[in-house]
Structures are given as structure tokens and as C-alpha cells.
């Protein structure tokens, strides 16, 4: 076992601990107070602007879970642009940060954040600093959500069950990649065109398998979340993971819609609506933006870990 430790600030530490401790490769977690100006603060002190951050001490097996991947899991649980606020919690103690004790971690942290930030187009508000001090929080805070199953949590704990689609495993499409697309695939993904309804064979494709971005190969959707919407386009209730899709306001054609684009390729995919089955969403996706890989063809590929 290759034990390593990192400290994370991501809003209320109850929810962050409940989420991170479920990730494969995490050995142990502890909540506490970090990088403040005074020694041994109490929860009351921290809640009254002591300057400490509510932090999660994460000990993990680096042979199972890389620091890069751990940070990617962390990013999906926070708002990286928010300053001193996560969810409904406001205060300096709720600032986001990554605090290291091994200087070799700093370039890994910075590289991971820079890569993720490049997909967003604006800077993150996440501080990256050496750990200057850390004090374990009171016992009643440790594993709080285990002791209080209905307790407050600003993080959907189910996020830990979503597969991690490594943002370093796929590349933005080159000119040659784009030239390999059909004219319709190019128009849809690069110029936000729309397939004619019922025109693409993937609309009626319901075999088990994986749907990836046709420009990059990044996994986007799985067949388990696909449904017959009778709208004329492939429809899904959700993406394979929260972080593979980007959302943009779209007021074109006199309509008020939410456009969805792929994370790595920035491909136009379609739109998302609130009329999915049983109160879920409907991701209405152009078949020309997708490549379907049947389940029996995933074995032996880089997608094998996504086989349910």
C-alpha cells in the first residue's frame, strides 16, 4: 500500500467527507480546521471568522487512486468559481482549497486544475497552498452523516457512484480529426446544426452499449439511461457522469433553451429539457454528434471499466 495524504476544502466538511470516503482507493478521512492564524480552534471559533478552513484530511492509496483522479473527483463536488460559499453555506471557512504536505504534489495539483479550468474558460477560485496547520474537529463532526443519516449535506453523495471519465485521457480534435467527419457530423458538432427528426439510426438504437463524442471518443451517455421519447432524436435521462457535459444558455431561433456540449471536444450535442420520464430530464441529442459502441465490443478497450 502506498499511503499518501492531501487536505481538501470544499464547503461544509460533513458532506465532503460523506462523498470522498466512498471513493475507491481512499483509506481514511478526518474532518478538521486548517490554515488558520490560531491554534486549536473550536467549531464555534471557526464559525465566527477565525480564518480557518473546514478541511478534509484524505489518506489514500496512491497505487489505486492517483492524486490527479482524486482532484477530479473533488472538482465534481464543488463550485470551483464560488468564493467563500458552497451550497447554502457562506463564510471564509467554506472557501475551496487544496493543501499539500509533500511539495511534489504541487505541480500535479496545478496541472490538474489548469487542465480542468481550460474547459471552462475562466479562472477557478481554488487556493493551492502548503498545509500550514491542521487541527482535528470535535468528535461529533467525524463521519457526521453516518451518525445523522438525514443530516444536512450540500453534496449529492451519489456522485461517488458515477464513473470517473479522466479528462486527461482524451484530446481536443485536430484538424485531421474534424476532416474525417461527414459533412452532417461536422455541421452538427462544429456549427450547432440539428439532425432532421427521425433521420439518424441512433434514434432507434437500444442495444446495450456506450455513446461517445464522435470527435474525441470521450464517453458521454450509456444505453441504460436511454429511453424512447418519440421526439425524433436519441434521448437520455442523464449523462454517464456529471462533468462530461457543459451547459449554455441558447436563445437562438426565438427559443429559450439550454444547450449541451461535450467537455473535451466542445462539440454541440443538443439540448436538455425538463420533460423526461418520471420527473427526470431529457437530454435530446443529435445522433450525428455520437458514436455508439456496443457493450460486447468494449472489452479489451480503454472503455472496459465502464461496462456495467
What are the language-model segments listed below?
Residues 1-308:
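Flexible coil/turn and secondary-structure edge motifs
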Amino acid at each position: 500500500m502506498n499511503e499518501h495524504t492531501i487536505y481538501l476544502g470544499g464547503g461544509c466538511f460533513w458532506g465532503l467527507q460523506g462523498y470522498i470516503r466512498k471513493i475507491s482507493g481512499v483509506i481514511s478521512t478526518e474532518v478538521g480546521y486548517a490554515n488558520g492564524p490560531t491554534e486549536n480552534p473550536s467549531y464555534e471559533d471557526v464559525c465566527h471568522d477565525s480564518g480557518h478552513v473546514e478541511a478534509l484530511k484524505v489518506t489514500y492509496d496512491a497505487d489505486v487512486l492517483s492524486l490527479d483522479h482524486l482532484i477530479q473527483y473533488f472538482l465534481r463536488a464543488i463550485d470551483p468559481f464560488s468564493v467563500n460559499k458552497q451550497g447554502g453555506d457562506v463564510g471564509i471557512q467554506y472557501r475551496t482549497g487544496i493543501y499539500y504536505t509533500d511539495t511534489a504534489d504541487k505541480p500535479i495539483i496545478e496541472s490538474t486544475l489548469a487542465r480542468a479550468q481550460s474547459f471552462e474558460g475562466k479562472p477557478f477560485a481554488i487556493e493551492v497552498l502548503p498545509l500550514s496547520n491542521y487541527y482535528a474537529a470535535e468528535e461529533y463532526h467525524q463521519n457526521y452523516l453516518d451518525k445523522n443519516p438525514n443530516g444536512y449535506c450540500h453534496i449529492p453523495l451519489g456522485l461517488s457512484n458515477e464513473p470517473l471519465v479522466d479528462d486527461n485521457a482524451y484530446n481536443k480534435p485536430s484538424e485531421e480529426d474534424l476532416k474525417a467527419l461527414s459533412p452532417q457530423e461536422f455541421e452538427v458538432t462544429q456549427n450547432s446544426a440539428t439532425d432532421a427528426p427521425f433521420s439518424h439510426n441512433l434514434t432507434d438504437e437500444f442495444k446495450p452499449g456506450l455513446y461517445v463524442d464522435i470527435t474525441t471518443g470521450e464517453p458521454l451517455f450509456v444505453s441504460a439511461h436511454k429511453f424512447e421519447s418519440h421526439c425524433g432524436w436519441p434521448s437520455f435521462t442523464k449523462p454517464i457522469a456529471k462533468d462530461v457535459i457543459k451547459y449554455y444558455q441558447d436563445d437562438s431561433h426565438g427559443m429559450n433553451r439550454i444547450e449541451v456540449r461535450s467537455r473535451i471536444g466542445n462539440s454541440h450535442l443538443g439540448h436538455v429539457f425538463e420533460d423526461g420520464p418520471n420527473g427526470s430530464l431529457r437530454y435530446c441529442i443529435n445522433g450525428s454528434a455520437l458514436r455508439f459502441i456496443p457493450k460486447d465490443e468494449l472489452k479489451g478497450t480503454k472503455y472496459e471499466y465502464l461496462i456495467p
